[in-house]
Amino acid sequence: MRYEETLSWLYGLETMGIKLGLHNVTELLRRMGDPHRQFRSVHVAGTNGKGSVCAMTESILRSHGYATGLYTSPHLVDFTERIQTSGTQISQGQLCRLAEEVRGHVEDMVLVSKESYPTFFEVTTAIAFAHFAEAGVEEAVVEVGMGGRLDATNVIQPDCTAITRISLEHTQYLGDTLEKIAAEKAGIIKHGVPVVTAEDGREALGVIEQIAAERKAPLRRVGAEIRFDMVESTIDGTTVRLGSLPTVTLPLLGNFQSENAALAYGIAIELPSRGVEVGEQAILEGLRRVRWPGRLELVHRRPTVVFDVSHTPDGARAVASDVRHLFGDEALLILGVLNDKDLDGIAKAFSSISDKAIAVSPASNRAFSAHETGTALRRYMTDVREAPSVAEALSTAVASASEDDVIIVAGSLYTVGEAKAWWEGHEAR
């Protein structure tokens, strides 16, 4: 298959919907020779910040000299972003070849039972694990797709698990309370395997503590056993002190990145107990070198243009606070949100820095329409317009902006991906 044909086949699997459970992915991987058993791993779940934590952890491990893998989702601009080895995205050719191999196994599975048809995410996960095995990855950092307990990635046996802060999300699949969602995310905790968490809310943390105790998994908490201090946040980066280490400046903006750095640090200091050595200099160098686009990403000055993928009210509040601190308290918001998110809560959170907004609908069949998003924004803002696409909204905003204006694109990875693709002159795919 050529690249476009491969993407067409993969995206066609989305018609299978979301099927939580490990049976199909386990069978698919078995037919492929169990590639996930050929590398060691770190597993990261949570709601806000798990992608950043994964990127930081991978950068730390690579700085120590390990051959690394990084599996995250979804992507911003190009599908190949999801699967990386030692900082390099899978090539289109490698993706096509592995997809062709996996497709053969999928077709064989379907001959046995139509119920065995793997989903888009299960197939993508299998491709990632096969690529890691072929590339000789020593330690892969794997981000959960949804939840944790029944997520396709939960077939790995990690050296450490991590759980970021938890919010209400995917309630139709994970449950309608923080306790239920925490139980699903804590499903990645393995017997005797260290777990670190940034969660400190009574409901969710209580569930994590209970499951960790039941599985005799040593638990370390950011802000308790894992100490950190946010030293400074500027447009040049975020300076943080982790434990007894010297201060380090991350090239990522936002106070919230200090907590993510603390969680990555917690992972790094737990790994030696599993025989995976990580030096202090690797921690510092990895954090200095980390790159993670779309997270309070400053893409232009005069006018100021910032992209952020925040998609929960908690995330939006954190971003709004950082935007106010770094750029002032008046911004034009371009917002596009998926329909399984708390649109009203997100709109309300961003209203603290904006009374002007352009509502859009990202190119996803799960997105709120521009009209629905605009209706939510009008509850909190007075100047709200709607645009037919993210690209048109951004081009219009930039064309009419003065040098002192601030433009924020937010609400979803899909929204930011389309904005980034337009900004860089590419097509999101």
Regions found by a protein language model. Give the residues of each.
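Hydrophobic alpha-helical packing residues
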Residues: T57-R62, F132, F350, L377
